[in-house]
Amino acid sequence: MASKFLREYKLVVVGGGGVGKSCLTIQLIQSHFVDEYDPTIEDSYRKQCVIDEEVALLDVLDTAGQEEYSAMREQYMRTGEGFLLVYSITSRQSFEEITTFQQQILRVKDKDYFPMVVVGNKCDLEGEREVTRQEGEALAKSFGCKFIETSAKSRINVDKAFYDIVREIRRYNREMQGYSTGSGGASGINGPPKPMDVENGEQEAGCCSKCLIM
C-alpha cells in the first residue's frame, strides 16, 4: 500500500536550447507532445505520483537552454534536489554541453556528487543520430549516474527518466542521513554519499508508478 505522506521533490530539467526539455516535461505532466518550438525562459509544473509505493509530488522546473539565460542557472541550481541533464541524440553540440551543466551544478552545490540522470532525447530520430548510445552511457558512467534515452514525441521512457531521478534523490538522502548520524550510510563507509553503482542501478524497473496532475 502506498504511503500517504506527500514528499515534494524539486526536479530541474537542464540542457542546451532545442533539445526537447519542454517537450519531455509537458509529455510527463499533460501526456501530449508539443510540436512547435517556443524557447522557454522558465516554467514550473507539479504532478503527484506514486513511485515504488511512495507518494511523491514532483515540482518540475523547465529551464532555458539559451546562453543568454545562463545567469539564471545558479539560482535554480541552488534549490534543485535532482537534475535531468538533457541533450538531443541528433546534436553533438548539445551532448558536449552536458559536462558544463554537470560541473556547474557540482560547483553551486559544493559537492563531488549530486543526484542527476543523463537523458538522450529524440531517440525516435534514429536516422539523424549524431551521438551513439554508448557515448551517452560512457558520459553518465563518468558522472556516476544513470543514463536513459527518451522520445518526448513517441513517449518512450519519459516517465522512467523522471522516476529514476526521484529514486536517486531518495538513495542520496538515505546515505546523507546515514553519514550525518555517523553510521556511514547505505554503503557502510564513513564518508559522504558516493555516486550510485551504475551497473546495478540499471537493473531497476520503471514500474510501480502512477501519476495525478496537480
From Swiss-Prot:
Statement: the UniProt record of this protein carries the keyword GTP-binding: yes
Protein name listed in UniProt: Ras-like protein
Gene that this polypeptide is encoded by: RAS
Positions of the propeptide segment: 212-214
Principal place of residence: membrane
Motif placement: Effector region: 37-45
PROSITE patterns: RAS (PS51421)
Higher taxonomy: Eukaryota, Fungi, Dikarya, Ascomycota, Pezizomycotina
EC number per UniProt: 3.6.5.2
Gene3D superfamilies, per the entry: P-loop containing nucleotide triphosphate hydrolases
GO biological process: signal transduction
Role this protein plays: Ras proteins bind GDP/GTP and possess intrinsic GTPase activity.
Annotated SMART domains: RAB, RAN, RAS, RHO
Subcellular location: Cell membrane
Swiss-Prot/TrEMBL catalytic activity: GTP + H2O = GDP + phosphate + H(+)
InterPro entries listed in its UniProt record: P-loop_NTPase (IPR027417), Small_GTP-bd (IPR005225), Small_GTPase (IPR001806), Small_GTPase_Ras-type (IPR020849)
Top-rank taxon: Eukaryota
Record keywords: Cell membrane, GTP-binding, Hydrolase, Lipoprotein, Membrane, Methylation, Nucleotide-binding, Prenylation
Entry binding sites for GTP: 15-22, 62-66, 121-124
Coiled coil (residue ranges): none
Modified residues (Cysteine methyl ester): C211
GO cellular component: plasma membrane
GO molecular function, one term: G protein activity
Family from the record: Belongs to the small GTPase superfamily. Ras family.
